[in-house]
């Protein structure tokens, strides 16, 4: 029997470090808990990184930097409301700079889906989902959205937050 199943963002991440150890980052109680382990799996360090907005999107442990994505609801459907924040950290999780996205046809960020990131050629690619502004049928439909951010200065290079496949549904 089918019962409303929704996707959600991943809260726990694990990556191997250059020295053969591991770094674990997990979103718990409005903060990112970062633990570093040596190659024998002994805890070397632990750090808490405060969430910057109320809704957690995801983490990316990159080659030279780490990234976290946060968001917040936009109940007024205001194009001036910050709905996504992409934050760049150094490899020790010290905050460096952010990229803010406002409006973006977003009522609720990350709703009913996940978030994935990758990097290549100095660009950070973020693919996630959102519940969009109310449509003519009176509903807030869910859809995918994508962003490309320049890693050096964290400027937004490209984004897509519109409605796809109008004739077939929302994807």
Where in this protein do the model-derived segments appear?
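Beta-strand-rich domains and repeat architectures in extracellular enzymes and scaffolds
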Residues: 1-32, 51-53
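Short, solvent-exposed loop/turn segments at conserved positions within beta-propeller repeat blades
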Residues: 26-30, 76-82, 134-143
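Beta-propeller blade signature
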Residues: 34-37, 81-93, 139-154
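Entry beta-strands of beta-propeller and related beta-repeat scaffolds
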Residues: 19-24, 64-69, 122-127
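A short beta-strand motif characteristic of beta-propeller blades
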Residues: 1-5, 42-49, 95-107, 155-162
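Acidic, serine/threonine- and glycine-rich low-complexity intrinsically disordered segments
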Residues: 127-171
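Repeated scaffold domains used in trafficking and secretory/extracellular systems
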Residues: 7-16, 52-62, 106-117, 161-171
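Blade-loop segments of beta-propeller domains
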Residues: 43-75, 82, 100-105
């Amino acid at each position: 029997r089918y019962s409303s199943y929704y996707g959600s963002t991943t809260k726990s991440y694990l990556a191997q470090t250059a020295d053969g150890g591991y770094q674990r980052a997990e979103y718990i109680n409005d903060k990112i808990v970062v633990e570093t382990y040596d190659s024998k799996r002994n805890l070397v360090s632990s750090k808490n990184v405060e969430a910057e907005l109320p809704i957690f999107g995801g983490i990316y442990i990159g080659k030279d930097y780490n990234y976290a994505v946060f968001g917040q609801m936009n109940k007024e459907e205001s194009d001036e409301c910050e709905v996504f924040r992409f934050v760049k950290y150094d490899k020790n999780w010290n905050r460096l700079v952010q990229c803010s996205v406002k409006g973006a046809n977003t009522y609720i960020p990350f709703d009913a889906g996940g978030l994935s990131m990758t990097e290549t050629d100095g660009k950070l690619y973020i693919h996630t989902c959102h519940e969009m502004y109310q449509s003519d049928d009176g509903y807030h439909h869910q859809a995918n959205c994508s962003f490309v951010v320049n890693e050096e200065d964290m400027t937004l290079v490209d984004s897509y937050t519109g409605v796809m496949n109008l004739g077939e549904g929302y994807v």
